Amino acid sequence: MALKYYKPTTNGRRHMSSLDFGANLTTNKPEKSLLTILKKHSGRNSQGKITVRHQGGRHKRKYRLIDFKRNKDDIPGIVKTIEYDPNRSANIALISYIDGEKRYILAPKNLKVGQKISSGPKSDILVGNALPLAKIPEGTFVHNIELKPGAGAKLIRSAGTWAQIQGRDEDGKYVILKLKSGEYRRILATCRATIGVVGNEENSLVNIGKAGRNRHKGIRPTVRGSVMNPNDHPHGGGEGKQPIGRKSPLTPWGKKALGVKTRNPKKPSTKLIIRSRKETKK
């Protein structure tokens, strides 16, 4: 999908860019049977307390039900449309199966309307097809990857992301993947993945341009701690501009903000990570 640039008719339009939706999308009307209501929570939990900051005030939108499990085995389908999804960075494709059922999937790069797709161990190694990792050859780029067999995809779902199959364990239980971040990790060979790279890779190059576009997406301003009151942030308070007054920068909750590992070392999946993304960059 190409980028569209704007003339500097206003300060907000200067340097602004957006995705040219007319280049790849085939319809602007979603499938009604696959829509559901998406409630606004504005970052609050069931008690009304803010659990996620900087959220609220977005535009109304419907949620598209996406097939992350890809468990419709040995039933071929045809790509009917490629559509915009306001709930994610990637585009989605509407698949019509020969038994009459319709499902949305993430649209990989180079997926075309009218193309046939399938899922299951016997599927061909073609863009859009979903197979167990054990059936996919080394060097293949995949996305929409499960962490537990049958639980639905959790990894590699954002626009432009990918993972590449590097090899297998000696017993064949695990498949070794290289992620776009540089991380190498093992995943059970019985987990499913979809062939190809997630489309809409230019999404990361979009220049928002003005604050209003983020407000439409439900992103509220991020305020510096140093301009808050002392009861709101450890950096707050003082007359005029003041230094932090602490040995190191702190989070709003009083924990060290720089150089502290946040991943739980006792997390069970740590043993499956062969090389972290930070080690790869060294």
UniProtKB/Swiss-Prot annotation:
The keyword NAD does not apply. It holds the Pfam family Ribosomal_L2. It comes from the Bacteria. GO terms for cellular component: large ribosomal subunit. One of its GO terms (molecular function) is transferase activity. Keywords: Ribonucleoprotein, Ribosomal protein, RNA-binding, rRNA-binding. Residues 263-282 have a biased composition (Basic residues). One of its GO terms (biological process) is cytoplasmic translation. Residues 215-282 are annotated as: Disordered. Belongs to the universal ribosomal protein uL2 family. One of the primary rRNA binding proteins. Required for association of the 30S and 50S subunits to form the 70S ribosome, for tRNA binding and peptide bond formation. It has been suggested to have peptidyltransferase activity; this is somewhat controversial. Makes several contacts with the 16S rRNA in the 70S ribosome. HAMAP family: Ribosomal_uL2_B. Part of the 50S ribosomal subunit. Forms a bridge to the 30S subunit in the 70S ribosome. This is Large ribosomal subunit protein uL2.
